């Protein structure tokens, strides 16, 4: 494999994999006791989600709904000088429905250029601009509640620049790469291998080349293999692994969850089999349209409503009419692309057995990287999360 070049800009979808990271962190952090509670003080965000859009009180012990955002603080954007604010572009957005009672998790990826209209002043029409225009992640939570009719209890925001540091702190993450990837001087070969920080960044950011006919949407699918590998890694975390990650979390993660809530969710996660962790994306009318010179895609109203009723309204009545914004929707359609973490795990295990004929746990190709000066996998105004 070639050697990936270091991108000139910190841009792209570096944060989606962290959806499970914070929840899983609570699991191992419980063993750290006082250290964990001290650590979470540095993660506490100043923003809180409005009580009016929370899960109804009578259901709060049965489910939790979490908005997870990867924030891109790209140089040149007009951010606040307040380091505690969530005022970057949320180039990664995932809605997580944790069925605490039924021991299931449903996660929905929302493409960063999904059209939301002008319900929040000064947006560019894309959902990833709402938190910046509205002054906080609470503005984005409100749009998701208003348009998708989904409650939001907590938020987690992650600085997108943290990916490489976290992966390298772990000494790499074992991932199944489902097909060869090559773009902009970087490449990965199909197979089960360990990705270091640079390789992981390329794997989750790339949206060009063979296998990426649908660009952003294909990239969302590829990222799930990384989530699968990361989940396996976090389930084997030791107390010392957690200790090494403490500084990273203090620097890059903000949440309105209390330490006790995070630990409780981490313990609840022990009861969730990977076969019961579902991932999907919002069904979309896929052809790009332009709104005020920004590319947008439209969430498919009926199909999205059906998806949410089946997987995200476990203990509430179905909602058949959403309030989604629309801007000249095209006839092309992309479904929710539902997959389960258990199936991804099985695919990875098969690949490992094929690569390691002796049945060992050792990965075969360790993907080494070196820094260089080259092109990013994203460019222009159509850069994706």
Regions from the PLM with identified roles:
Residues 86-90, 121, 130-138, 157-161, ...:
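Soluble non-cytosolic domains of exported or imported proteins
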Residues 2-104, 301:
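Entry/capping segment at the start of metal-dependent catalytic domains
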Residues 80-83, 125-134, 149-154, 209-218, ...:
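Second-shell loop/turn segments in exported
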Residues 129-189, 256-258:
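Amphipathic, coiled-coil-like alpha-helical scaffolding segments used for oligomerization/assembly
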Residues 114, 120-123, 256-385:
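C-terminal solvent-exposed extensions
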Residues 61-64, 88-93, 102-110, 122, ...:
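Extracytoplasmic
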Residues 57-62, 168-248, 253, 369-371, ...:
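Flexible, polar/acidic helix-loop-strand segments at domain edges
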Residues 90-93, 124, 137-145, 160-164, ...:
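Extracytoplasmic/secreted envelope proteins and their assembly/folding machinery
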């Amino acid at each position: 494999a070639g050697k990936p070049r270091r991108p000139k800009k910190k841009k792209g979808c570096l944060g989606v994999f962290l959806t499970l990271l914070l929840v899983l962190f609570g699991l191992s952090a419980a063993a750290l006791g006082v250290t964990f509670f001290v650590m979470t003080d540095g993660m506490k965000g100043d923003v809180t989600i409005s009580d009016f859009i929370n899960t109804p009180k009578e259901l709060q012990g049965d489910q939790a709904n979490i908005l997870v955002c990867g924030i891109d603080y790209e140089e040149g954007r007009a951010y606040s000088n307040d380091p505690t604010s969530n005022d970057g572009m949320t180039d990664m957005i995932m809605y997580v429905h944790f069925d605490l009672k039924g021991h299931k998790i449903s996660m929905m990826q929302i493409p960063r250029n999904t059209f939301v209209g002008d319900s929040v002043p000064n947006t560019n029409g894309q959902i990833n601009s709402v938190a910046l225009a509205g002054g906080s992640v609470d503005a984005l939570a409100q749009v998701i509640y208003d348009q998708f009719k989904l409650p939001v209890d907590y938020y987690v925001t992650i600085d997108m620049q943290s990916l490489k540091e976290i992966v390298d702190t772990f000494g790499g993450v074992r991932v199944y790469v489902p097909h060869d990837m090559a773009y902009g001087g970087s490449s990965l070969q199909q197979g089960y291998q360990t990705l270091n920080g640079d390789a992981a960044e390329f794997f989750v950011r790339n949206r060009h080349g063979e296998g990426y006919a649908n660009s952003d949407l294909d990239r969302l699918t590829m990222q799930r293999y990384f989530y699968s590998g990361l989940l396996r890694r976090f389930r084997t975390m030791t107390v010392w692994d957690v200790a090494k990650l403490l500084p990273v979390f203090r620097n890059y993660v903000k949440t309105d969850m209390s330490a006790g809530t995070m630990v409780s969710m981490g313990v609840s996660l022990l009861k969730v089999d990977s076969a019961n962790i579902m991932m999907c994306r919002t069904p979309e009318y896929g052809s790009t349209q332009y709104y005020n010179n920004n590319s947008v895609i439209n969430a498919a109203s009926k199909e999205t409503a059906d998806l949410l009723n089946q997987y995200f309204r476990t203990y509430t009545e179905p909602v058949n009419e959403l309030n989604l914004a629309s801007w000249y929707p095209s006839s092309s359609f992309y479904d929710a692309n539902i997959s389960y973490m258990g199936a991804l795990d099985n695919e990875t295990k098969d690949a490992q057995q094929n690569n390691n004929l002796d049945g060992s746990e050792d990965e075969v190709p360790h993907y080494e990287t070196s820094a260089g000066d080259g092109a990013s996998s994203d460019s222009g105004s159509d850069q994706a999360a």
